[in-house]
């Protein structure tokens, strides 16, 4: 089959070589963006007098027909034409004749593919931003129900101090807010047009790059043609931001997996987000949370893969850069899917309030309250820490908890202990006293919820 670029070649590659080099199996994902970019390009060619109006109208009509077919999933692509750009050009020529070959005037596939990817990521990042907001709202909705639900807070996966469950959920809301900010800020760099940079050096045609940027909704153009066609920073930044987001989702997934286990029993995931066992009838496995935790690794891999591809490339375009797309497409799919799944899991999970509160009474997470109690009465904190540590050891040896100790045992440890020590040991009291800024006290959590809801526009 004759290549659209085959003039200087005396023989064609074998089919298996074409298949190895072709990107159409995956870059057909860019079909709508490719046609949209071509529509802007040919419009500009007409406005600049580079192509006659009659040719421009024929090309635009043909492209619009192809765009409608693309949206209906009716286009058939061929490996013989390598990539999405040549496939679309061949289809256009087949439809309107040789005039379709004028579309590529003043343009290279190098600036064309870069434009396609900028358009693609701009759409997908905006979708991701909307989904992040959706997950935040789901977390806030659960948090509102559980301001006064208390649970153990953990360090080293050991019970540390009692906290409000809402406080725990809000920690993830703030993590997601940073993700939202990173993706939002990346749009400034994504929303630049490389179209018109040519292969690497610009073009001799009197094109108007600002006009195509305007038609495509870009905020401006790349100011250097070499940079325009060789830049993949915007994809690397997207993969980096996605890795950070997936890391946050993975951490919450890990907690949901633990909390839904028989050992914790803090939450129950809805049946829609769990599966059973092929052999053990009693099993309810948190598969969706586990998959999100697992898929985080593949997103990390895509980031490292593209960094490795780009690290040794001289300017400008190199075929290595074809490897930028599959990881980008897969990351988009993974991130969007993970956010949708997670929102559903959070919205529908059943919180076992009694199990959480019971757990705060069967440990020593109130030990810090004792140390603070003594410090508030004038004992240096390090001495208080020592006193309470010995009391904890005594409890462990006796098989009891701090609230079970009689007052005389406390008095023997320090004369500063009084009857009110038992109020301090109450987990609910302990939580509610921590009203420093950003703390877990109920009043502070409600104040934080109000701030978050105002930011999310859900008041």
Swiss-Prot record:
Its EC number is 4.3.2.1. GO terms for molecular function: argininosuccinate lyase activity. It is found in: Cytoplasm. Keywords: Amino-acid biosynthesis, Arginine biosynthesis, Cytoplasm, Lyase. GO terms for biological process: arginine biosynthetic process via ornithine; L-arginine biosynthetic process. Its main location: cytoplasm. GO terms for cellular component: cytosol. It comes from the Bacteria. It is an enzyme of class 4 (lyase). Pathway: Amino-acid biosynthesis; L-arginine biosynthesis; L-arginine from L-ornithine and carbamoyl phosphate: step 3/3. CDD domains: Argininosuccinate_lyase. It catalyses: 2-(N(omega)-L-arginino)succinate = fumarate + L-arginine. Belongs to the lyase 1 family. Argininosuccinate lyase subfamily. HAMAP family: Arg_succ_lyase. This is Argininosuccinate lyase. The lineage of its organism: Bacteria, Bacillati, Bacillota, Bacilli, Bacillales.
